[in-house]
Regions:
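Non-ligating segments of multi-cofactor redox enzymes
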Residues: 1-103, 107-150
Length: 150
């Protein structure tokens, strides 16, 4: 009866003077592991144009059917290829963050980023379109999110 009580107190006193395990979350953020799969990001090439060629392989590879894509003919201002994604949407309520879209992309246009703050106030905000997924044009492709391009 007294033995378990002593064991419990010894464990408590052992951890009492160690540094805390918890993190003050809004002020401090824990760095993500290299293989962490967060919010998807659409990449740009070295000229600042979109990399997506609208092949639709990401949409086909998605087991949750979370990616919707509409292709359109390109005039050379959006990207270098003949087609581009006129509509590109990812439904976050369906996405299971498996990374199959990243693996299926032949031109490395989409990858899983490190962003994990995905909370929104409205259900409609869970559908992210191309403008919300595209990397800003000023960021160099090789240094985006610390990831190398293929």
């Amino acid at each position: 009866m007294i033995r378990p009580l002593i064991n419990g107190f010894s464990l408590t006193f052992k951890h009492l003077f160690r540094r805390p395990i918890t993190v003050d979350y809004p002020n401090q953020k824990v760095p993500m592991f290299p293989r962490y799969r967060g919010k998807q990001v659409l990449m740009r090439d070295e000229n600042g144009l979109e990399k997506c060629v609208a092949c639709g392989l990401c949409s086909v590879a998605c087991p949750a059917d979370a990616i919707y894509l509409e292709a359109a003919e390109n005039d050379g201002t959006v990207m270098a290829g003949p087609r581009y994604a006129a509509v590109y949407q990812i439904h976050k309520t369906r996405c299971i963050f498996c990374g199959f879209c990243e693996e299926a992309c032949p031109v490395s246009a989409i990858f899983m980023g490190k962003d994990y703050e995905l909370a929104v106030y409205s259900k409609d905000d869970f559908v992210w379109d191309k403008n919300e997924l595209l990397v800003p044009a000023t960021t160099a492709p090789a240094t985006q999110e610390g990831r190398e391009t293929r």
